[in-house]
A protein has these predicted regions:
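A cross-family "folded-core" feature that marks the main globular domain of proteins
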Residues: 1-399
């Protein structure tokens, strides 16, 4: 079966009803005779569970077994995922899209299109972006710059395989990504090269004597690259109004200022006060993997005195609930401090960092989850923050 015949199957399957040979010929940009020959070939290749029905003056209709459809399409659910990728990418790049153009590009019937648009609408809602459909105007989105940037990050992380190979790049010199991962990030940033931004971040990490974990490091490179990219486009961010949290500290701000100095020289741009605040936010929500020395750790703790006090209270509570004195376990206390730095910052801004291990943690370590949930009280009492189960799962991993 050739590609055109596969495309005809997709069109008929998604349409769900009769289509004329002329309609198919126009879509495939071939003659009606060619379509008739293709339909004959398709009939011969289908299993007994599937069939192609033709009616004079009505057209052709495909009835196909679901398993055979997935086998023939070669994609199954991935086909819908690819269409979702296209829609989200176009809307994030251009702000609008016509449903007709989408249907023509992917040969999607109305029922299939509605299903996909419902999924896309849910994705944008989850990322705090307004998704609108207006008759005669198509599909559009509206957003704050802050939510737009976080949505771009979510989109990149969720659809990395779809970005890979879309731009040709060499190996990264500073960004700790292999070629395919680096290519995906460049594509998600519309061709922007984040390697120099990665160098500035790494140099600031060295100044602080710390190292962020892998996932946080990737997110930080992406978000700070967006600062450069969006500033060049004249798209300024405004940080959301949030109540001051006792554990805020000064480390994020200092990290952002040092990084901004490097970036301004590297890219010959001027970063606004709001951009520096955004970079501080990006640093604060990042998880630290380790400090290079005790001296570096103490300096960082001095920038976050109230967080140190909150960590002590958290450790005391965990010790009491678990029936194990963990106050003298220096490794545990240090790990809890680093986790709480990112957790409190994410909760302050209402950021839900999805815990990919949550199901396994809840299944294998229910007792640790139960202990971690006891911390809900001090988050509310001391910080006026509402903790979610994803963050509880992160904390449970350290108990």
């Amino acid at each position: 079966m050739n590609k055109r015949q596969s495309d005809i199957i997709k069109v008929l399957y998604r349409n769900g009803g009769y289509m004329t040979f002329a309609e198919l010929a126009e879509m495939m940009n071939v003659s009606v005779k060619t379509v008739r020959n293709d339909i004959s070939a398709i009939k011969e290749s289908l299993s007994e569970k599937s069939s192609v029905e033709t009616k004079p003056h009505v057209g052709v209709k495909l009835t196909m077994d679901e398993a055979e459809w997935k086998n023939i399409s070669g994609k199954g659910d991935c086909a819908d995922k690819e269409i979702c990728f296209f829609i989200i990418r176009q809307l994030l790049k251009n702000g609008n899209l016509t449903a007709q153009g989408l249907a023509e590009k992917y040969y999607i019937g109305r029922g299939e299109l509605e299903k996909i648009l419902e999924e896309v609408s849910g994705w944008f809602m989850e990322n705090h972006i307004l998704f609108e459909r207006k008759r005669g105007k198509g599909i559009s989105i509206s957003y704050s710059e802050f939510n737009y940037r976080l949505a771009c990050l979510s989109f990149y992380r969720e659809y990395i395989p779809f970005f890979e190979g879309k731009v040709n790049v060499g190996d990264a010199k500073y960004a700790f990504l292999n070629r395919s991962e680096y290519s995906a990030m460049c594509a998600a940033l519309d061709g922007f090269d984040p390697d120099r931004a990665a160098r500035s971040i790494i140099e600031t990490e060295q100044d602080f004597g710390l190292e962020f974990n892998y996932d946080s490091g990737v997110n930080l490179i992406f978000l700070i690259s967006l600062c450069i990219l969006r500033t060049r486009k004249g798209k300024s961010v405004t940080m959301p109004k949030t109540a001051k949290c006792p554990t805020d500290g000064e480390s994020g701000r200092i990290f952002a200022e040092k990084t901004a100095e490097k970036l301004e020289k590297e890219y010959n741009i001027s970063l606004s006060e709001e951009e520096i605040k955004f970079m501080a936010f990006a640093a604060d929500i990042s998880e630290i993997r380790q400090f290079e020395s005790e001296s570096a750790r103490r300096k960082f703790e001095a920038m976050n005195i109230e967080l140190c006090r909150f960590t002590v209270k958290a450790v005391n509570l965990i010790s009491e609930v678990a029936g194990i004195d963990l106050r003298e376990d220096r490794f545990f206390v240090k790990q809890m401090f680093m986790q709480l730095k990112a957790t409190t910052s994410r909760l302050k801004y209402g950021i839900i960092c999805k815990n990919r291990l949550l199901v396994q943690i809840k299944t294998k370590y229910p007792n640790m989850m139960a202990v971690a949930w006891f911390m809900e009280n001090i988050f509310e009492k001391e910080l006026e923050l509402e903790i979610n189960e994803h963050e509880v799962g992160f904390l449970a991993l350290h108990i």
